């Protein structure tokens, strides 16, 4: 048993959108957030049936469906606390365990991610490959990623996160210099970190983890907002 926080994945190919007979669900092109138009929704609840993650809900008082809106005013930089900079959602920034990280990426015309080597999300998902999608077999291409826990049954984790589980846990159990630094960005600031850089320092510790060499350095990681402002 382990606790798994499940939120709307704002999928690249949302099943809720395809199922809505009223065309009330749409995906914003500027940031990929999936929203329900409350004026068009008539509460048929087809979105609830279609979503494999069960993240749309029916509100009896309004007789319409609702879902996570990804705190889009904060993403747009309209929260005064952010000084005009894009901010992480409330669920991300309020996590007392500092285990959540949100980011924004750009897409190529074919829908693939543009290379952004020093973007924290790009690194965790496409370089280190320790962050995996939940139930990728559903085919919706979810945009919520998880670093799988180490002490849970592997067959169970493979069912949840796909075939990359073993490699992710192996990498995460004894993180290399860059991965260890990037993991320090989690929960450090409410503003979205678009880019990081690492200032290297001398080695301070060395040991062996599960038969693999692990070295820790006294490095400093610096995070920058979209406009280049130093935020971490």
What are these regions (language model features)?
Residues 1-5, 9, 17:
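A structured beta-alpha segment of the ubiquitous adenosine-cofactor-binding alpha/beta core
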Residues 7-9, 39-43, 115-118:
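N-terminal start-of-chain detector that recognizes signal peptides
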Residues 13-40, 46-65, 70, 77-109, ...:
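Iron-sulfur cluster-binding cysteine motifs and their immediate structural context
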Residues 42, 52-53, 73, 117-119, ...:
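General N-terminal targeting signals
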């Amino acid at each position: 048993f382990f606790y798994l926080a499940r939120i709307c994945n704002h999928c690249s190919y949302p099943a809720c959108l395809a199922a809505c007979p009223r065309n009330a669900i749409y995906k914003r092109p500027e940031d990929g957030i999936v929203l329900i138009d409350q004026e068009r929704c008539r509460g048929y609840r087809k979105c609830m049936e279609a979503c494999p993650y069960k993240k749309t809900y029916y509100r009896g008082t309004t007789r319409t469906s609702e879902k996570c809106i990804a705190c889009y005013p904060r993403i747009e930089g309209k929260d005064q606390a952010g000084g005009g900079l894009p901010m992480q959602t409330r669920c991300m920034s309020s996590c007392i365990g500092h285990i959540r990280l949100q980011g924004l990426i750009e897409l190529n015309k074919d829908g693939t991610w543009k290379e952004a080597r020093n973007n924290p999300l790009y690194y965790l998902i496409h370089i280190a490959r320790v962050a995996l999608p939940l139930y990728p077999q559903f085919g919706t291409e979810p945009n919520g990623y998880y670093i799988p826990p180490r002490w849970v049954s592997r067959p169970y984790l493979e069912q949840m996160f796909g075939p990359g589980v073993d490699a992710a846990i192996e990498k995460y159990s004894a993180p290399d210099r860059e991965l260890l630094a990037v993991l320090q960005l989690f929960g450090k600031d409410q503003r979205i970190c678009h880019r990081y850089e690492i200032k290297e320092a001398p080695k301070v510790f060395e040991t062996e983890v599960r038969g693999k060499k692990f070295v820790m350095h006294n490095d400093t990681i610096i995070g920058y907002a979209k406009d280049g402002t130093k935020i971490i």
